[in-house]
């Protein structure tokens, strides 16, 4: 297991990881040189995420060829930082959030929060719905393994994985070009339009098998 956490240097500094993106890349290359393919800890979204940091994270995952199966990809692309009670980030969130903020709630375990940038929060909401749908389509016996070749229905799962990556990139580009405004109704509409892309992909490959 390798806790990379981010492909964005500003985020790594905020996480106090004491490492850089280039050092993370070197670590992955070194492990692979010795035939080791680790599982990765990664945080796509956190309270201070920006569209730039999300883009950096996504480009990092693509460059390092980490998104190898639909199970792995779906987890990596929507994972949010968990703010556990007793951690500095939890305490910081408590100090920053007014009591009247309906977007953040605190339990005895963790803080539920909205990302400060509403555009990123909206993007996260869409991608979370998409990724959960992808996970629900996986076979019940599917293991979250980095080697998709161990599954009997590899072509279909590869297609699902490629569709998931394409949806993420297409939607992120829309937010970057401001073609998707932040509006709850529009966000729900975009989510509903993206989900059928999985059904279309799966139907095509079922017809070929």
Regions found by a protein language model. Name each.
Residues 3, 7, 35, 41, ...:
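Residue-identity detector for glycine
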Residues 1-39, 43-67:
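Conserved non-cysteine loop/helix-boundary elements of the Radical SAM core domain that shape
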Residues 10-14, 44-52, 68-125:
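Flexible glycine/acidic-rich beta-alpha junction loops that bind and position SAM and/or redox cofactors
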Residues 90-91, 96-209:
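Radical SAM enzyme core and accessory elements
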